[in-house]
């Protein structure tokens, strides 16, 4: 793909998104595509936004990035809360700047809502710390069941979907602030600019074995030591980072409530459950073009297939 004059955004340049479950090789394909298409990579993994969360998020090292510019890595401190609305703003700015340089933006990640926020027409309601604090206090005083009944009266769709207290409080906060149900802010499947979504699929049993091996490699590469260092910086109290896959399990090792073997098994199981949710999320989007991550020609075959998909748009 030939690049137009730098500094002038070319609306013919598509946004390429590489999506799919954890462990399928998305980062490797994104690098290969960026090199092939004269592109730059934009991170859409919510946890790779955090500085210091490297081993446990499989963040590529500078050497592994092979000279390809990367955006939205290491932009948050561990105590900060990740915001999908802020990510949307920053990701779209990065994409526009890349296209303005005449290069191809390659978005990569498995955080479904973050990907949709970057790609699709979606509006995010604001937040209010005072309203949230009041709702959190009500949760402590009145209990989850009472607040769930209140939510069901004004937003039955959200009441059926909320899986934890954080989402329950958020749904009530949104209704308090806007008078609208949280479900009314759900994204449309409508791209805000020309986009090609490429998904990586893998046989479930093969992926499960890869995930177990991946956790073992992370532990060998110093994941427990990483968690110990992050604990000193506020990992336990972090509203987002502290709940990342594997990190609570390793914090339990540090405080003596679990063995390393138990933490490993729990992490592997949690990661497998997470990839199941990712398959459901991305599989529900008919716009995703799926490639077999087990291509017999490896990364070269995947890259060639992805380039053909981009060229066909």
UniProtKB/Swiss-Prot annotation:
Cofactor: Mg(2+)
Keywords: ATP-binding, Magnesium, Nucleotide-binding, Transferase, tRNA processing
Binding-site list for substrate: 22-27
Gene Ontology molecular-function annotations: ATP binding; tRNA dimethylallyltransferase activity
Site residues by UniProt (Interaction with substrate tRNA): 111, 132
GO biological process terms on file: tRNA modification
Subunit and interaction comment: Monomer.
Family: Belongs to the IPP transferase family.
Name of this protein: tRNA dimethylallyltransferase
The keyword Heme belongs to this UniProt entry's keyword annotation: no
Species this protein is from: Kocuria rhizophila (strain ATCC 9341 / DSM 348 / NBRC 103217 / DC2201)
Gene3D superfamilies attached to this UniProt entry: 1.10.20.140, P-loop containing nucleotide triphosphate hydrolases (3.40.50.300)
